Amino acid sequence: MYQAKKMLLLGSGELGKEVVIEAQRLGVVTVAVDSYEHAPAMQAAHKSYVIDMLDKAQVREVIEKEKPDLIVPEVEAIATDELLKLEEEGFHVIPNARAAKLTMDREGIRRLAAETLHLPTAGYEFANTYEEFKEAAETIGFPCVVKPLMSSSGKGQSVCRSASGLKSCWDMAMEGGRVKNGRVIVEEFIPFESEITLLTVRAANGTSFCAPIGHEQKDGDYIESWQPHHMTEQQIKEAKHIAKSITDELGGYGLFGVELFLTEDKVYFSEVSPRPHDTGLVTLVTQNLSEFALHVRAVLGFPIPEITQLSPGASRPLKAPKELADYAVEGLEKALAVKSTQVRVFGKPVTKVGRRMAVALSAAETVEEARERAAEALSHLSIT
């Protein structure tokens, strides 16, 4: 009988769904775990479990029961201390349990980047209470960026422009974090020209990079991404240096989403996630190997050949305007009539305000044209 490897995903969103599909293409048995039923990756996986992923006993129970060859965290909010123990007992966490723990919140990774590796970052302060937060904002100065230490898809992030906005920014951070009433980071506001994601792959045959992905954020969540993003040779050199430094320090195999700010004369490190990145959905139409295929190859220990850009492309996510228990994605016929365009509907069981429900992906001969096509496709889509 075929001796398949088994991969267990902790977190089963739309990015996890693509990872599951790529893993199955290489004969891997997949187990999808999340905190709610019918999550996107569960719809494609061989098996699924619903647990509280911040509960170490539940995480341990499902891992000991399934005995996976690979544990693949797909979100930040996991009982990472338990992953450290499981790793010591012989389980294989991707890329490793330390990286999962460091990137679980913004403090560990920011201190590592700025204080250990001395990479260029925005100035920052941390705060546990509203009083500390006010002091931190005064120290950093206005405008400043406020983020919960642990959140996903930009939830709870805001830009505070004056002292009068402090209370609302604090409340937003408290509400948006994965851990309610948690710690926050207050960052210097960098007047950047653009934000990019440099997808960085650590594999058996070394480190490789995808072409830079430009993206636009609104309320801390991405509303558009495109590839390639134009950068000078010097900017690309600096970006690769930062990405290699941070991913080498984290170690292990897999794809990392390294977020960077570009100013006229400098590249700043912002964040890193040791897994496929939402802005990287665009690679489904731009590259010979998508970010998901690259991640799966790397974590299985396979080499990564040359990553080829097949075409410029762009992505636009469809977000839910309100909460619905029953919903439909309308306008697919018109959206799919747009040239060189695909739509991926994620199949989430219910909508929430601002929740990503689908994505329009367009290719074209130029980035500008791809962005126009993706915008047109998105304009036809709605949730009812």
UniProtKB/Swiss-Prot annotation:
Record key words, sorted: ATP-binding, Ligase, Magnesium, Metal-binding, Nucleotide-binding, Purine biosynthesis
Record domain ATP-grasp: where = 111-300
Spell out the InterPro entries in the cross-references.
ATP-grasp (IPR011761), ATP-grasp_carboxylate-amine (IPR003135), ATP_grasp_subdomain_1 (IPR013815), PreATP-grasp_dom_sf (IPR016185), PurT (IPR005862), PurT/PurK_preATP-grasp (IPR054350), PurT_C (IPR048740), Rudment_hybrid_motif (IPR011054)
Reactions that this protein is recorded to catalyse: N(1)-(5-phospho-beta-D-ribosyl)glycinamide + formate + ATP = N(2)-formyl-N(1)-(5-phospho-beta-D-ribosyl)glycinamide + ADP + phosphate + H(+)
Name its GO BP terms in alphabetical order.
'de novo' IMP biosynthetic process
Pathway membership: Purine metabolism; IMP biosynthesis via de novo pathway; N(2)-formyl-N(1)-(5-phospho-D-ribosyl)glycinamide from N(1)-(5-phospho-D-ribosyl)glycinamide (formate route): step 1/1
The cellular component terms of Gene Ontology attached to this UniProt record, alphabetical and capped at eight, are:
cytosol
Q: Which residues bind ATP?
A: 106, 147, 152-157, 187-190, 195
UniProt-annotated binding residues for N(1)-(5-phospho-beta-D-ribosyl)glycinamide: 14-15, 74, 278, 348, 355-356
Q: What is its EC number?
A: 6.3.1.21
Quote one Gene Ontology molecular function term.
Answer: phosphoribosylglycinamide formyltransferase activity
Task: Indicate which residues the UniProt annotation says bind Mg(2+).
Answer: 259, 271
Q: Please give the function described in this protein's UniProt entry.
A: Involved in the de novo purine biosynthesis. Catalyzes the transfer of formate to 5-phospho-ribosyl-glycinamide (GAR), producing 5-phospho-ribosyl-N-formylglycinamide (FGAR). Formate is provided by PurU via hydrolysis of 10-formyl-tetrahydrofolate.
Q: How does it assemble?
A: Homodimer.
Which family is this sequence assigned to? Belongs to the PurK/PurT family.
Protein's name in the database: Formate-dependent phosphoribosylglycinamide formyltransferase
Q: Which gene encodes it?
A: purT
